[in-house]
């Protein structure tokens, strides 16, 4: 934990702690039985039935291993097995058990079996000397358990670590000396490199090293790392290239260029190099090599030249000590020859724990269970762009990829900016004075910035701004920044969130004048922007993406490789998609955390009756310009009054209509794209209500198959808006922002008339959160009563205040004093625009408006 907490690159002495993890025992058995065990059975087919009962994790191939693909050995003593990243010896111990049983079956004594395993069969290597010692101890203890007399034997397991001091002496022969000197030079970095070191020795030089192996630990290591093995079984270290120290990084780039993305992929290449032809390696590692573009060359090489015989696709929760979705694994067996038959795959992703996954594997009922996928041809994977290991892909989806053009052929798909230090260059828009904020021009400092965000479809997540003053001068100077694809900046686009663990991709329409981040990568359609957005939000696209890359990240390359088809119903699809964007945009701007926010929803509904809501069109419901019209009318005409409870009911009705319309639209779009791609037998168009991405500020939850309204949230949004009115952030008689900058003018602070009442803006942007009888005439409780009277009518004031308190389950005074600040911080993502000042014991509390604060604000609070 301490090593990972420091982040950055790992030093040589930190690599063991950063890369060691205990492999579940049943997965070790699976790997050993399907490598060492399978080689033995290929050579002794008459014993298959006897061992099949003992080896419950052995996977039967669709057909026996072809004769020309069998790795033959003469005697059991010839079978060489190794773990080149053995840790404390868990895998070595399982190899020992299996080999021991084979020896006993073939008539060897216990001592003979143990001696042959230690001297002839088994090798372990680890760069951590402590792990090596544990491994030696565990194997020796196991040997003594098998035969008590072995404690007196002078035979130890062959488990090696990196030489600390002793290197190889230089031979007298000059030519050999040059080779041995190169070996010694490489061994000096052994603490960083471990088993991935490559020693290029001529036969004569290797023979010379062999002659020194018994008395020289460096020689023993070199021999072990230049040996050809029949079987390798490993849980290799996981370490991305960004965490490698300079020595390790350079060596990997120089010697393992195609697999440099991670240390586990380096070990995949190493395993092939160290295997004999027809040998097998079993490995558990991260599933990322199966899908990510950074491992595409590795996949291509593997699929073209070697055979994935079987695989347990484990996914998340493989290691019980590692929770969450990020660490996702696969265990598999690869044979060193080209594939002559299909592979056997087990899809265990749904197991909630390692034990669940084991039971899924042991108890599968055969083909068609969505767990077992037998005899899958490797050639199928190369039909899919990027050749992901998509063993579960049906023929219908395979045809979709084969018969469609890639999306990138009609749309540019681009990564965006990496600022190098988001803490310096990014802000939420409401943190910035609107004097410095540019939403459409190029003369200010802060510009709209698209950076992924929460799972939200169609529109939204437009809440950040970036320092792009003087064409991004400061970002360009920052050493780790990257400015990509600047010619696409500020163009209309379809963006998506890079990382998602919820319901797949969420694509959104982006209006012009936005810059975009690498996490907000975007596609730039020439004409069919709404069609593209509809496709990306469809089930078809989501399933295709899960084939291209079922990890948590939707990379630019994955989007570019999607199969993309036009349709004769394109115009109809675009109309529905436009409506979805329209509804989602209206939802986004109806919250005050959007810079297009106009007016609180309850106030805007005063002019809508129940009958109006039943008959009014969707366009009128979402007409954002009507807010200012309503505000102006209420400022100029006779006072109007309304019951808050009635307005909340109207709110329910209005937003239920919009929510269900969006839901129906999404299902219709799924229906259309399922037909376009001919996937009627594969997919259904239904969309769960919890995947509809409006009303995401807790206004509703889904219970059963219906919306449950949280009226207290709706009313809290009203009180938050009221606070903004008092501070001058908003005006009741005008829509949108009013004061969001320091030093407002006298004119900006002048009182105004609304609904027949004079509305005053607080003179200093400070109001107390105190009891009604505290003596402060501008405290929040008194202001709330006045606000409710001014906006909703004096005749309903008491009824409306009682309704608020009844809904909250507490008094308004208690809400302001105990809950408002917490709710405000949550709404503004811990970037509050109203700052809380409180005495040590909380006897006195007040709120100050960020944009109106001055150096004298704390003193003014004390003096008041």
Walk through the language-model features, giving the residues of each.
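Short, glycine/acidic-rich hinge or "gate" loops at secondary-structure transitions
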Residues: 43-59, 110-114, 148-156, 586-599, ...
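Flexible, glycine/threonine-enriched loop-and-boundary segments that flank and lead into catalytic domains
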Residues: 54-80, 205-233, 253, 315-317, ...
